[in-house]
Amino acid sequence: MACSRARARAYSSAANLGPGFDALAVALDAYYDEVEVRVCSGGNSVYVDEVEGKFSSGVLQGPNTAAEAVRGLLNMEGVEAEVGIRVYKGVPPGRGLGSSGASAAAAVAAVSHALALEVPVDRLVFYAGLGERAAAGQPHFDNAAASILGGLAVVASDAAGKLRVFRVPFKAWFAVVTPMNPVPQGKTGVMRKVLPENVSFRDAVRNFSRAAGIVAAAVNGDLKSMGALMMSDEIVEPRRRSYVPCYTQVRKAALQAGALGFSLSGAGPSMIALAPSSEAAREIAAAMEESCICCDNPMTVAAEPAPGASVVG
């Protein structure tokens, strides 16, 4: 039985950026996961051998996004193989930083390389997004797209239901604060349940236009406009922020320290602020940490847009 190995890295991400729910996410070089796979021909199973790394203890037993994503890839690419997976967990789970998406992205990138499949990036995003079912109960593609593509990722489905993904390269700086307060099991799914099933036509149009404005501002390097639009969500963030420790205090501190914009990172509890420079990002991160008085052991970091998933071994 012939076997091959590959190891891939994928970075953390911040989804939504305010009004871009399930459509926008930015890869951040704050944290990363690595996944090593051993792929053997002739088998028909996918399993996780080991989860290690700084945040391995936060990974729940049971369905795993990396394994789920690999199963989807093998099934839809028509490949039979036995795949053993080792996950190095460098992205804190359950914190709104795309931890599950990073594992899934690294896994499909590694398997694609090990099998020399040369899977196009849009399909890699699709398979990684399928892996999110293990964490959220349903596929979603924003974090997976950011971790696969890098930079600012935009995801959409066309009239035929085909997933379309786009990478927007841009220069920016972010401050990230991550409260380590306890979160409910299956936090992503729980935080989706607080959202409304229906919204008004007016609110939908306003959010669509603001999300489009974020993309245009990123393309044009207009960080001031991008930051203002990050703070304009009227649908998702207003319903989630009450679940986030010290949201109001941290937001106020970030803006007083010079942040151009502020939003939850995904479903939280992490929060991100857009900064005008790398030095400002560090200063804003310090202010956010100091203000997070109701946060348990908050982690803060200054970050920039990260590259996409890559094979590292």
UniProtKB/Swiss-Prot annotation:
EC number: 2.7.1.39
One Gene Ontology CC term in the entry: cytoplasm
Pfam assignment, any one: GHMP_kinases_C
Listed GO biological process terms: threonine biosynthetic process
EC class name: transferase
GO molecular function: ATP binding; homoserine kinase activity
Pathway: Amino-acid biosynthesis; L-threonine biosynthesis; L-threonine from L-aspartate: step 4/5
Protein residues bound to ATP: P92, P93, G94, R95, G96, L97, G98, S99, S100, G101, A102
Catalytic activity: L-homoserine + ATP = O-phospho-L-homoserine + ADP + H(+)
Major subcellular site: cytoplasm
Physiological role: Catalyzes the ATP-dependent phosphorylation of L-homoserine to L-homoserine phosphate.
Name the record gives this protein: Homoserine kinase
Organism, as annotated: Aeropyrum pernix (strain ATCC 700893 / DSM 11879 / JCM 9820 / NBRC 100138 / K1)
Name of the gene: thrB
